[in-house]
Curated annotation (Swiss-Prot):
Annotated coiled-coil segments of the chain: none
Classification via PANTHER family: ARGININE-BINDING EXTRACELLULAR PROTEIN ARTP, MEMBRANE-BOUND LYTIC MUREIN TRANSGLYCOSYLASE F
Principal location class: secreted
Protein's name according to its UniProt entry: Probable ABC transporter arginine-binding protein ArtJ
Gene field: artJ
């Protein structure tokens, strides 16, 4: 395990232990349920999306299935808008959020997050049509397309004088640029790496993030008052990683580059 990933695991365990020590092991919800209920937002390929058969598939869904097997439960995937996921998690309507959710300081104040994919994200990807070796500052574009509820949307919202157009799915964001409605879009690097293969007319450039805006990869969200469940999921992820299954899933979904 690399040093950065180890630091992320240590940070997670420290947070969970702090909850345990303050008596938060008394968890709400039905811990004896035979189902592992996972909330997702199926608009973020290859992590989760709806295939041609109308089924929710992707890297996260396969991982959720592996975790449910480790927990001895049946997987139950439920779709929500991205903005509603954390609320439903806190209300124990779902056991976990697995939806390509970035680990950020603001989210760590609300929920527990178990790292499972990626390391520090130090830049975002600017997407535009045609060739442009010297992109303009974001404030110079008439609008910037981005997906609702994502870290990149939150980052853009923190910048003054950037006109943002937010959409529910990555596909809508890219079509906004393809049709010339917004001159540029901003994507997370691993998403851009996969989805842009189907959009050869689009080009990219990088947007460096200030150090205090770096993201610690992707995490599985668990309600902060359910640390025992978080530890079980964390142990399952560790086993899945050690067995090589996580690497196989990354390869299957084109996330191992």
């Amino acid at each position: 395990m690399c040093i950065k990933r180890k630091k992320t695991w240590i940070a997670f365990l420290a947070v969970v232990c702090s909850f345990c020590l303050t008596g938060c092991l008394k968890e709400g919800g039905d811990s004896n349920s035979e189902k592992f209920i996972v909330g997702t937002n199926a608009t973020y390929p290859p992590f989760e999306f709806v295939d041609k058969r109308g089924e929710v598939v992707g890297f996260d869904i396969d991982l959720a299935r592996e975790i449910s097997n480790k927990l001895g439960k049946t997987l139950d995937v439920r779709e929500f808008s991205f903005d509603a996921l954390i609320l439903n998690l806190k209300q124990h309507r779902i056991d976990a959020v697995i939806t390509g959710m970035s680990i950020t300081p603001s989210r760590l104040k609300e929920i527990l997050m178990i790292p499972y994919y990626g390391e520090e994200i130090k830049h975002l990807v600017l997407v535009f049509k045609g060739e442009n070796k010297h992109p303009l500052p974001l404030t110079q574009y008439r609008s910037v397309a981005v997906q609702t509820g994502t870290y990149q949307e939150a980052y853009l919202q923190s910048l003054s004088e950037v006109h943002i157009r937010s959409f529910d799915s990555t596909l809508e964001v890219l079509m906004e640029v393809m049709h010339g409605k917004s001159p540029v879009a901003v994507l997370e690097p691993s998403i851009a790496q996969v989805v842009l293969k189907d959009f050869p007319a689009l080009s990219t450039a990088t947007i460096d993030l200030p150090e205090d805006q770096w993201v610690l990869g992707y995490g599985i969200g668990v309600a902060s008052d359910r640390p025992a469940l978080a530890l079980k999921i964390e142990a399952a992820v560790q086993e899945i990683r050690k067995e090589g299954v996580l690497a196989e899933l990354e390869q299957k979904w084109g996330l191992n580059n």
